[in-house]
Design a protein with these regions (language model features):
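Short coil/turn segments at secondary-structure boundaries
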Residues: 52-56, 105-113, 211-213
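A short beta-sheet element
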Residues: 141-143, 147, 151-201
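Non-catalytic DNA-recognition/assembly elements of restriction-modification systems
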Residues: 5-105, 237-278
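A short glycine-rich beta-alpha junction/loop motif
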Residues: 1-7, 174-182, 214-238
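Short, solvent-exposed loop/turn positions at domain surfaces
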Residues: 136-139, 170, 216
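Sequence-specific dsDNA recognition surfaces
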Residues: 90-105, 118-150
Length: 278
């Protein structure tokens, strides 16, 4: 390998360290930007962010909230309710279909459709970074969904890591994927799927859902009953749109910061190569 002078070696080190420090700074700022989304949601929806954790020794519940639900303590322990002091609040099941019935009947079995396994969803931004392809013939045994549906992971650790995304640009408007997804769809045009998606990505919602896990160690899941029982505020449609636009803008800014940081480091590496080899 070429050995430049001590002065040139120090210059190389300085260039790299400076770029690495700047990249780290921008990535950290992006991380803080993403984390601030949770506080923004609670503030704009007038939800109490200082909810006390329920006492572990006992619970007092209205009989109306228990009927039809599980009776085990984990179902009610450490719940974080998105109850607004300003807007009307509803159980998730009253505003969204959860695992709606979906049939591919009427399609030719060789019709190409999208295939989305768990690993295709980015947990940081909640987006699908790769869409694979399959056919209706090969979709048997998988979770089925349609254009615009929300996929929300039910199993640990995918759920608490944020494996959720809205499916878009599906082949022929339909797809299939992991059986460990819940599929959600708005019940009417008064609720934005993007709005529900953002609420269900809130850190406290995911943390509370983790407390409700059932199943054996290593394969614990959130039950559909728990998901249906989550309370969410529903402001006017125009307010939902404003909230979604604001948060998507915050996410875009975070992405841009990360890209800038990565670009600075890559440019520094190229500069170093020129110094050493040219």
């Amino acid at each position: 390998i070429p050995i430049p002078s001590m002065k040139e070696q120090q210059k190389v080190v300085d260039i790299y360290i400076q770029a690495q420090v700047e990249r780290t700074r921008r990535h950290q700022t992006a991380k803080q930007q993403l984390e601030s989304i949770d506080d923004y949601l609670l503030d704009v929806l007038h939800v109490d962010k200082n909810q006390a954790t329920l006492c572990s020794n006992g619970y007092v519940k209205n009989i109306s909230t228990i009927l039809g639900n599980r009776l085990d303590v984990s179902f009610y322990r450490n719940r974080f309710e998105l109850i607004s002091k300003k807007y009307s609040n509803f159980p998730l099941s009253s505003v969204a279909h959860i695992d709606p019935s979906i049939s591919f009947r009427g399609y030719d079995v060789n019709t190409p459709i999208s295939f989305i396994p768990m690993e295709c969803i980015d947990e940081i931004y909640g987006e699908i970074h790769v869409i694979k392809s399959t056919t209706i013939l090969q979709s048997k045994g998988y979770t089925k969904f349609e254009e615009g549906d929300l996929l929300w992971a039910k199993i640990t650790p995918c759920m608490q890591n944020g494996k959720s995304a809205i499916v878009k640009n599906l082949e022929n408007g339909i797809g299939c994927g992991s059986t460990e997804f819940f599929v959600l769809r708005p019940r009417n045009n008064n609720v934005l799927m993007d709005y529900i998606y953002l609420l269900l990505r809130h850190h406290e919602v995911l943390k509370a859902a983790q407390s409700s896990f059932g199943g054996s160690a290593g394969e614990q899941r959130v039950s559909s009953q728990y998901l249906k029982s989550i309370i969410i505020p529903i402001p006017d449609y125009s307010i939902q749109k404003d909230i979604v636009a604001k948060i998507y803008n915050m996410k875009s800014q975070a992405k841009q910061l990360q890209k800038e940081g990565d670009k600075l480091l890559e440019e520094a590496k190229q500069k170093i190569e020129k110094l050493i080899f040219e």
